[in-house]
Amino acid sequence: MDWLLATPQLQSVFSSLGSLVGGTYVVSPNALAILEEINHKLTYEDQTLRTFRRAIGFGQNVRVDLIPLLENAKDDAVLESVIRILVNLTVPVECLFSVDLMYRTEVGRHTIFELNKLLYNSKEAFTDPKSTKSVVEYMKHILESDPKLSPHKCDQINNCLLLLRNILHIPETHAHFLMPRLQPGSGHQVSMQNTILWNLFIQSIDKLLLYLMTCPQRSLWGVTMVQLIALIYKDQHVSTLQKLLNLWFEASLSESSDDNESNTTPPKQASGDSSPMLTSDPTSDSSDNGSGGKKESCEERRQALREGTDATLHEVSRKGHEYQNAMASSNAANYILEGPCSAQQPWSDCEMQEYKQMTAVISEPLNLSQPADNVNYTTNANYARTTSTDILTKTTSLKHEGFKPPAPRRNTLSAILSDNYAPLSFISAVKLGQKSPHAGQLQLIKGKCCPQKRECPSSQSEHSDCGYGTQMENPESISTSSNDDDGPQGKPQHQKPPCSSKHRSKQRIFAVPQDTKDLRRKKLVKRSKSSLINMKGLVLHTPNDDDISNLLKEFTVDFLLKGYNYLVEELHSQLLSNAKMPIDTSHFFWLVTFFLKFAAQLELDMEHIDTILTFDVLSFLTYEGVSLCEQLELNARQEGADLRPYLRRMHLVVTAIREFLQAIEAYNKVTHLSEDDRYRLRQLQLQISATTDLRCLFVLLLRRFNPSIHSKQYLQDLVVTNHILLLILDNAAKLEGGQTIGLSEHISQFATLEVMHYYGILLEDFSNNGEYVNDCIFTMMHHIGGDLDQVGVLYQPIILKAYSRIWEADYDICDDWSDLIEYVIHKFLNTPPKSPMAIPTASLTELTKEQNQEHTACPWSQEDMDSLCWYFVQSKRQNDVIGNIAKLFSNNGNKIKTRISIIQQLLQQDIITLLEYDDLMKFEDAEYQRTLLATPTSLTTDSGIELKESAYGKPSDDVQVLLDLIRKENKSQHLVWLQKLLLECCYVKMMIKCGSCQTDVEPIMEPVVYHCMFKQKPIPVVQWNNEQSSTMLYQPFMLLLHKLGIQLPADAGLIFARIPDFWTPETMYGLAKKLGPLDKLTLKFDPRDLEDAPPSRHHTGARNSLSSISSLEADFGDSEGLALIPEVDPAVEKAAAAASAIPNNEIFALPRVKHCNSIIRYTPDPTPPVPSWLQLVMRTKCSKRRSPATDASDCTSTSTMIADDEIKSYASMAQASHTKLNSGYPTSTLVCMNKLSNCSFAAPPNENSSSSGCGGTASSMSMPNMPDGNSDALMKTSFERLAVTGARYLRPSNTDQDYSALVASVYENEFANSDNVSVASDLTRMYVSDEDEKHELQLQQVE
């Protein structure tokens, strides 16, 4: 507690800021310097104990010193400094340090308690209206001072918004506090949050926010604005706001019938209106927005909104001062502001009688001097105190009407909303039977709501629609789903499904009688022209939850009409562009989820949501869904990780997509849309139907559903959203230009035991689900059990039990679902049970039955598998490696391991390559050798692909062997899946290079690939369904991915494999062609654009982790200009590599070992196979010292000398790298590989030359246009390589002993780095390939 010793000095510093003189607070002349000192100490305080701010809290300096200074300071610099200090003091505790760590100690818990107390006292201090008034007025002053805001002034506005955000974010520890100042002796409890919100809205924070959303500098505070709006709606349920809107419309209908008789005079036009009230045709269905038949553009409306807001900012400031003066003279009973009513019609008799009864009602004429559709509203009020509480009782039964004559009917909602529209601050809640919250003199400008009630498809819990930031104790309640009052909570009514053969679920009906629609639209017009709104004028009125809900109901309408589309657009653009400054995406998801349902309910014109209902937004939501699914699963694997943020974001993504799709359905039924709007909706649906990632996303999310961490509400939202998407896909196929979608094939991905089990979990609670949710479940089960004839996946206890309960309870469901239940139960009872199958442990390559049986007979325990690698290292020096490993197992008391099972286990643990496996197996198993002999070796494989006469065109190529093996095992569909992904990456890369926008491109770009390419991130190979997931467990396919240069999940420590983002379109197109023919695939681009492109001079294909160059050679195209590069002296190359090893530590861009997670394997980045400039120079010098080979004997002697020199240098380098460079790299072989990798280019093989490419004729040796002739020697890996010469197989006599010693030393070095064993073993195989090719070369030359 040493920091308390500084408290007297601290109190002296704060007391020097100012003092009260005769009841007036006088600011000290040195206040600015003192504030700067305080801010400096706050910035550099103890980062753990936070002693300085704790001392401030202990001394109550926020309430005693800073708030009075904020309220009375006139100097802008002082105000700026005070606000900056208050922002710093109100930062949440969790942003200061790790709360979990601090809770573990007594000192930490005490620190947290004191900081929370400081925050609570700060929030309590801001319940004074003067404190928030000072902040709001300061922002208005900045905006009025200069239309062109400087960056410094923008920072000042952002600090004000941050302060309001921090204050509203502070939790109320005691939930409520007493306000004896407002209610003496009553003891009525009032929420601090409600009080602050009430004060802010009276001080016209709503108008200010709407202006800031549309000003040119909105990008500087867009994120803060979203956070502030989210906190304003905290703990507000969507269902509550929807009910208020619907109740208001229902109450308005009862008032319209009386007006229809006598209201015949058309309303007068406001001075700022630019269009008449009536269209040329009252029943016109056009979308004219009242601008002389010309639809304003987005920028025009935005500019007009800013101009209209600027015109009223001075008025807002003036009214604010009037409000503050009225607070000082609160002894007056009430104030009535008189003024001309030129834009108003006379009141009705009923209204006049009601007005006479309301002695505390204040009204003010509407300021209509602004352009139509550009008027904002204010809520500047002069408080008035009444002496009679009876007024409250009387005003609760009053009804309000704006003016007597209704406007003639217009069918275009856009014209209704644009004609002299200005958002509401607050509509009298008395007609809803609630207390009107406002007190005092108000300037209120009208707003509109759409009369039609929107039916929501799901019936869910009341806690499902909390505003952003609500924390519920029950995890099942944490959701943002739709309403709980739009579906039956008890027994659903009997309802027949539609007759559609594909989707027979209940269709939502929006049918409203036409006369009811007309009455509602008349009421909207009447409200749009209304200028007098009667409000209860009690300064002592304390707001409750209902008052705040009514207040936010009106702000919701204003926000949707004036700022929603701008704010979403701004946040979306920042999420795509601000890669360096991460933004919490949950704000964006919440904006779409929370407000889009209101836009559909009000049937707002499309121009108000033109930036939300776009394919760009839906594409981003799809990409985020995949990304969050991977992040959630990764964090779920980490013990003790906090999954709540990921669960929250994941749920918000699903609900945002649901609201997006529901809005499309709702607007498809709106009758007053223009042709342009309908065309945009059709195009959006066609884009959705063409997007594979979106529909596959729900297959992925349902498969990855985890009942232990996910809530049932999340599962329900998944099922409902997927159902809505299927309906849209079905309808999109019927549109003009729609593509035929294989829905049956898509639905078959859901026909798994796993997914149907989750449907059964949701069906268990059928009595509480609601009719629509049950329809979604039964529809999917009907398709799977009926159309797909896979009723077997429904034979699960949880599903059958639910069926039995529904059947026994005589639950009233439609006939089709009853038939489904009866069919499944009958089929299950009459299906004979099958004997349990013994699932064999198949070998990785599934080649012969004998191998499988032998492998099954030799089970491997975890201890055996762990010992295998060590035994392999020990036995590497032996001639019979496999026999020695079997002997070691037998000597250590283990069961006898067969030789074949040891070889298979070596391959399974990635200790040997597939080609090494082939070499070992063909000497162990005669049948396996016969299978290899049957492999086609001609220039045309069994797949019909013509292979070029090059290194990678030979069947012995690693990639070609894997491709042949995958095709032989009837797994070609996996290659097609990879081909499609590579072609999509190629297409997106080409479009991004052309600068095309995602919306403008036809055909569309898949969301996941597009956003990864746009953000320059590797593209994930997402396994959408079970079949693709099993593919990633298939060892040959995984080896193929690695050979192609695709980063495996284990290499990156992620769930999905990754395609490098730096690959060029030519590279990706070449890989796709290598995997198989492209004739049957639909290409989105013209392949001639890539084939005619200039060849790349650098290699961007496969990585050097499994082979020195890998099977993907750099395609140099016209390589006649490249001369042959002779071999370099290994000693010289070794010295050059050693000299550059230290400064080039980051050559592989790998993190150091101490920063690596033990579960992550790392693979070095691809490096070009072309020698570096130093290698070129050294090899050129060597070529001058050596005479060129003139005949076969010279070539043989030269190659033999080079091979012997390299073998000796390799052995010495392996030891040097282990002792000197092991600490700098994850494995010593990485450095060793950097030194050893050299490329020798020779002529290609021909009729007169051997397969090695060295002993060719003079003509073949003089051909420089085939640089890949000897590169195949760098890829082939084997212990004892068979050289293919025609159809005859030759076996080398023996293996060099020096080489064996080298391999053993390398394995010993790798075993010391256990986390990277697989990478080290892969690199060692490159040396095997390199050395064996040189021995093969010598052998063939001798023969």
Swiss-Prot record:
Q: Does the keyword Chloroplast apply?
A: no
- Residues covered by region (Disordered): 256-314, 453-512, 1247-1270
| Main localisation | nucleus
Where composition is biased (Low complexity), the residues are: 273-288, 489-498, 1249-1262
Q: Which UniProt keywords apply?
A: Biological rhythms, Cytoplasm, Nucleus, Phosphoprotein, Repeat
Q: Where is this motif: Nuclear localization signal?
A: 517-527
Single annotated GO MF: DNA binding
What Pfam families does UniProt report for this protein, alphabetically?
Answer: TIMELESS, TIMELESS_C
The organism's place on the tree of life at top rank: Eukaryota
InterPro entries given in the database record:
Timeless (IPR044998), TIMELESS_C (IPR007725), Timeless_N (IPR006906)
Localization of this protein: Nucleus; Cytoplasm, Perinuclear region
Compositionally biased, Basic and acidic residues: which spans?
293-314
> Which residue ranges have biased composition labelled Polar residues?
471-482
Q: Which residues form a coiled coil?
A: none
Q: Which GO terms describe its biological process?
A: DNA repair; DNA replication checkpoint signaling; entrainment of circadian clock; replication fork arrest; rhythmic process
Q: What does this protein do?
A: Required for the production of circadian rhythms. The biological cycle depends on the rhythmic formation and nuclear localization of the TIM-PER complex. Light induces the degradation of TIM, which promotes elimination of PER. Nuclear activity of the heterodimer coordinatively regulates PER and TIM transcription through a negative feedback loop. Behaves as a negative element in circadian transcriptional loop. Does not appear to bind DNA, suggesting indirect transcriptional inhibition.
PANTHER family per the UniProt record, alphabetical: PROTEIN TIMELESS, TIMEOUT/TIMELESS-2
Its quaternary organisation is:
Forms a heterodimer with period (PER); the complex then translocates into the nucleus.
Protein name, as recorded: Protein timeless
Q: What is the lineage of its organism?
A: Eukaryota, Metazoa, Ecdysozoa, Arthropoda, Hexapoda
